[in-house]
Regions:
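Iron-associated oxidoreductase/ferritin-like identity signal
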Residues: 1-194
Length: 194
């Protein structure tokens, strides 16, 4: 999409575009919305990737919500509250990703058909409280790795998507830490590597 070559000075820093050129570029292809001539990514590929991120966040909302409703056992009320809080935060991620897809000219895919195959993480209910915590920790670890890869992928080609994912990653890392701490509290020791 980027048809505007970046000129560089002797030190390698890009020249700043003059205001008149910026104004002229902004008037071209206004139907493209936020996607301007300086957008460095592949819009269709970005939307495709973000559809997978959206599916992942939807699955996380569903899993955390299910666990918030069904968790039982000693100290389950505090864990249920943690699950409910995470579901709320995952829903905020879901909305941010859906809005970004829309900004790029796509239609967010909320269709439940095929949701599990589009998602990086799996939907697992867990048989008991510890299983639920483990499933959420696994899902968060998948999300952390996936989002780190995507942040590197988008790099400077799509800084807005990258920054959005960096914000989501920060929360996903907090969720993973929360689930790890809950697992240690309920198993009485740090989990061993498999």
């Amino acid at each position: 999409m980027n048809d505007a070559p970046v000129s560089r000075d002797a030190s390698g820093k890009p020249f700043l575009t003059d205001v008149q050129t910026l104004r002229e570029r902004a008037r071209k292809n206004m139907a493209s919305g936020v996607v301007t001539t300086t957008y460095g990514g592949d819009v269709d590929k970005t939307i495709e990737i973000l559809q997978s991120v959206l599916a992942t966040e939807i699955v996380c909302v569903l899993r955390y919500t299910m666990h918030a409703v069904t968790a039982t056992g000693i100290s389950s009320e505090s864990v249920k509250a943690e699950f409910a809080q995470h579901a709320k935060e995952e829903q905020a991620h879901m909305m941010a990703v859906a809005e970004r897809i829309d900004q790029l000219g796509g239609t967010p895919n909320f269709n439940p058909e095929g949701l599990a195959t589009r998602s990086a993480s799996q939907y697992a209910e867990g048989e008991n409280l510890v299983d639920m915590i483990k499933e959420n920790l696994i899902a968060e670890r998948i999300a952390v790795d996936h989002y780190r890869e995507l942040i590197r992928y988008f790099a400077d080609d799509d800084p807005a998507t990258r920054v959005m994912l960096e914000g989501i990653l920060t929360v996903e890392e907090e969720h993973a830490t929360d689930m790890h701490d809950l697992l240690v509290a309920h198993e009485g020791h740090p989990p061993l590597e498999d």
